[in-house]
Structures are given as C-alpha cells and as structure tokens.
Amino acid sequence: MAEYLASIFGTEKDKVNCSFYFKIGACRHGDRCSRIHNKPTFSQTVLLQNLYVNPQNSAKSADGSHLVANVSDEEMQEHYDNFFEDVFVECEDKYGEIEEMNVCDNLGDHLVGNVYIKFRNEADAEKAANDLNNRWFGGRPVYSELSPVTDFREACCRQYEMGECTRSGFCNFMHLKPISRELRRYLYSRRRRARSRSRSPGRRRGSRSRSRSPGRRGGGRGDGVGGGNYLNNERDNMRGNDRGNDRDRRKGGGGGGGGGGGRY
C-alpha cells in the first residue's frame, strides 16, 4: 500500500495531494483547494509570486477585463529583457549560481508574472527565499517561497510551445515567456567570464549593452515600459560603473543592429 501511495503522489490519481501544486507550484483554487498543498522545506527552486508586470496586460477596463496597451513588440521585448537581466544578475550575484530562471506569461491570477528561479544549491535557494521576502520591487512587496517545481518540462504547456493551446493565457500550465537571443548569449557568456575570473582575479565584469530609445527609460514610472522596476536595495558600485561605461561606449561607437548585435 505504501508503495502504491508513493507511486501516485502528485499525480491525478492522488486524491489527497494537489497534483497542480506539485507540478507547477501554484493552484487556481489557492487555500480553498480540497487537496493538500505540500510546501517543501527544502528545494532548489524559489517562486517569486506575480513579480513580473507585463505592460500589455497591466491596463484594465472598468469591468476588470484586460486591455492591450499601445506597446510595440520591440519595446515589450526590451522591457522584459531588462527585467529578466536585473533579477537574474542580482540574484545570482547575491545568492549563488542559477541553473535556470523562468517567467510565466499566463493571465490567471495564480500564475501571472510568476518568476521561478532554480539555483544550483538548495542552501542558496533557501537563503534567497528568506531574504527576498524582505525586499520590494516596483513599489510592491516581494512574496517568495520555496517551490516544489524542479522539472519545468512537466510544468509547461506543450500545446503552447507548439502554438496550439486553446486556453490562451488562462491555461493552468506554464506559458513561459522567452528572452531574446542576445540576452541569453550574454547571461551564458557572463557565467563563463565569472568562471574565468575565478582563475584570473584581475578581470572585471562586463555588462550587456542595452539599446534604449531616448527618454523611454525615464518616461513612465511604475510598472510600464521603462518604469525602473528594480529590487529595492542599492546596486553594488561595480555594476553601476559598468552600465555607465556601456553608455559611454554606445555614444562613441555608433548605433548597432538589433537582435544578436555585433558585440558577440
């Protein structure tokens, strides 16, 4: 009997434990769910609930329905890449190596804007979960907890990945929002540079070049494009200097192309 219960744990056959919470770390029924949400005491993965605010979905009409904001695809991708980079870099620098980070593009309240950060070590994840609960982001408190999700292949909507999901943003499986190829190359090359620095202490950290339109970064405040959504602790001086150097290089080096610009 014990072997059978263990074999069905977290599956649809399990009538005691919530399979959605086990697979996705979130359930649309929340505390009203008739099945148990077994919150892990240790895990590699930290969930930051509803952290990312998509400008295209943030506007609502009087009846509460979503309105599509007038934001171009290019602006949307830049806004998202900046958000992703800031969270990824700060969490990896502060808490430890990140294996993967995923952001949900769903619209359901239990999944919208959820950020899942899978650390290499469980101790780093525990430290991050505890510390981030004392942080603010975009004028809102951060709600973090350890998540049971470690295999995102089981949590993702396969139909969405093939462009065939009929539930749109209200699907109960993860619709993951992709980052640009440029940012992906930067984050992985950054990791290689970090490992190289451990062998050569004198090397400095680089920073990804960002092509921002004049005035957009300081334009809308809050959760819109260019709204300055940063974790509300001071950045270390080195990162600030690196960004300043990037701006100087862009002024002196002329405009680059889009996509995977010539820097890499």
From Swiss-Prot:
It is found in: Nucleus. Its main location: nucleus. Residues 190-264 are annotated as: Disordered. Keywords: Metal-binding, mRNA processing, mRNA splicing, Nucleus, Phosphoprotein, Repeat, RNA-binding, Zinc, Zinc-finger. Residues 233-251 have a biased composition (Basic and acidic residues). InterPro entries: Nucleotide-bd_a/b_plait_sf, RBD_domain_sf, RRM_dom, RRM_dom_euk, U2AF_small, Znf_CCCH. It holds the Pfam family RRM_1. Coiled coil: none annotated. One of its GO terms (biological process) is regulation of alternative mRNA splicing, via spliceosome. One of its GO terms (cellular component) is nucleus. One of its GO terms (molecular function) is poly-pyrimidine tract binding. Disulfide bonds: none annotated. Residues 44-149 form the RRM domain. A zinc finger (C3H1-type) spans 12-40, 151-178. Residues 190-219 have a biased composition (Basic residues). Residues 253-264 have a biased composition (Gly residues). The modification Phosphoserine is found at residue 19. The keyword Metal-binding applies. Necessary for the splicing of pre-mRNA. Binds to the polypyrimidine tract of introns early during spliceosome assembly. Belongs to the splicing factor SR family. Associates with a 65 kDa protein. This is Splicing factor U2af 38 kDa subunit. It comes from Drosophila melanogaster (Fruit fly). The lineage of its organism: Eukaryota, Metazoa, Ecdysozoa, Arthropoda, Hexapoda.
